[in-house]
């Protein structure tokens, strides 16, 4: 009688066979795997920081791609695969693979060990134009503050933008030889191309060079002694632009709207450059008074008071 076979004996008698998968992998996967595993510079026995330093030293060493292969060369990885061309690893690819290995070890790009900056540092000292408070021209900023009323700076800035736009779109001015502009000014045809320089030339040309100061009681009989004094550039520009605003406010309005005031100021600036504005008369009057009273600079009363000019 044959011996009985139980289920356990039947399972033990089975033989399990497994077929090995074909070793066909992509070239990129083989190169990356061989680089990360068999790289001589990344040994698992060393700490990650030491491995990274060794990789950086090897990348800085010069080598020739013609005579000897570069480090981390993977030409032998695909030697057993028939029909595949040899893989040449450039220095850029080697650096990229080393960065991948550093990321695999947990080293970040912003680590202290990696020198340099991503975008570079600017040269010091920084120019004043890069400051957000001084990004505009000095003359434009000064004239905007003089245009401001009741602390409404945004309205003054809008008016200044309209003034510059009017100067930019206006035709070239016709200069008057009897009232010359400031020395070194650009030609009349170039002024509309740069409205900021247009405004600067108009203000500096009509700005007075001196001011009259009165000293009470020094002229005798309770009369004040008028003495001419030079003034700095900022005060000269402030006086000239205030004269322009006074002339604009005295002229009749041509209509209502928030753009009319800016247009009248721009028209007066063009009139100043062309020599048609009455601001030139104020400048000539101040200079005539200074010429007439220049003898008061040597007055004995001023010398006794200790005033020197």
Curated annotation (Swiss-Prot):
The keyword Ribonucleoprotein applies. One of its GO terms (cellular component) is ribosome. Keywords: Mitochondrion, Ribonucleoprotein, Ribosomal protein. GO terms for molecular function: mRNA binding; rRNA binding; structural constituent of ribosome. Residues 51-61 have a biased composition (Low complexity). It comes from the Eukaryota. It is found in: Mitochondrion. Residues 39-86 are annotated as: Disordered. GO terms for biological process: ribosomal small subunit assembly; translation. It holds the Pfam family Ribosomal_S7. Its main location: mitochondrion. Component of the mitochondrial small ribosomal subunit (mt-SSU). Mature N.crassa 74S mitochondrial ribosomes consist of a small (37S) and a large (54S) subunit. The 37S small subunit contains a 16S ribosomal RNA (16S mt-rRNA) and 32 different proteins. The 54S large subunit contains a 23S rRNA (23S mt-rRNA) and 42 different proteins. Belongs to the universal ribosomal protein uS7 family. Component of the mitochondrial ribosome (mitoribosome), a dedicated translation machinery responsible for the synthesis of mitochondrial genome-encoded proteins, including at least some of the essential transmembrane subunits of the mitochondrial respiratory chain. The mitoribosomes are attached to the mitochondrial inner membrane and translation products are cotranslationally integrated into the membrane. This is Small ribosomal subunit protein uS7m. The gene is rsm7.
């Amino acid at each position: 009688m044959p011996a009985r076979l139980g289920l356990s004996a039947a399972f033990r008698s089975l033989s399990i066979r497994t077929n090995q998968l074909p070793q066909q992998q992509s070239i990129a996967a083989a190169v990356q795997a061989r680089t990360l595993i068999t790289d001589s510079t990344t040994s698992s026995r060393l700490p990650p920081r030491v491995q990274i330093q060794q990789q950086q030293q090897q990348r800085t060493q010069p080598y020739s791609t013609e005579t000897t292969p570069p480090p981390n060369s993977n030409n032998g990885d695909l030697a057993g695969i028939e029909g595949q061309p040899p893989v040449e690893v450039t220095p850029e690819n080697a650096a990229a693979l080393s960065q991948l290995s550093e990321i695999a070890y947990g080293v970040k790009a912003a680590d202290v060990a990696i020198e340099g900056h991503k975008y570079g540092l600017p040269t010091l000292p920084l120019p004043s134009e890069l400051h957000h408070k001084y990004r505009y021209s000095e003359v434009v900023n000064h004239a905007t503050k003089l245009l401001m009323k009741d602390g409404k700076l945004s309205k003054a800035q809008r008016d200044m933008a309209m003034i510059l736009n009017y100067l930019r779109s206006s035709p070239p001015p016709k200069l008057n030889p009897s009232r010359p502009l400031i020395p070194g000014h650009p030609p009349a045809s170039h002024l509309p191309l740069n409205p900021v320089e247009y405004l600067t030339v108009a203000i500096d040309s009509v700005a007075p060079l001196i001011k009259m100061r009165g000293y009470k009681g020094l002229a005798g009989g309770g009369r004040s002694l008028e003495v001419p004094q030079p003034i700095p550039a900022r005060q000269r520009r402030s006086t000239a632009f205030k004269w322009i605003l006074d002339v604009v406010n005295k002229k009749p309005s041509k209509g209502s709207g928030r753009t009319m005031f800016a247009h009248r100021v721009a028209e007066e600036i063009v009139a100043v450059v062309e020599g048609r504005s009455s601001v030139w008369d104020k400048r000539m009057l101040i200079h005539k008074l200074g010429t007439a009273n220049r003898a008061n600079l040597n007055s004995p009363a001023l010398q006794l008071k200790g005033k020197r000019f």
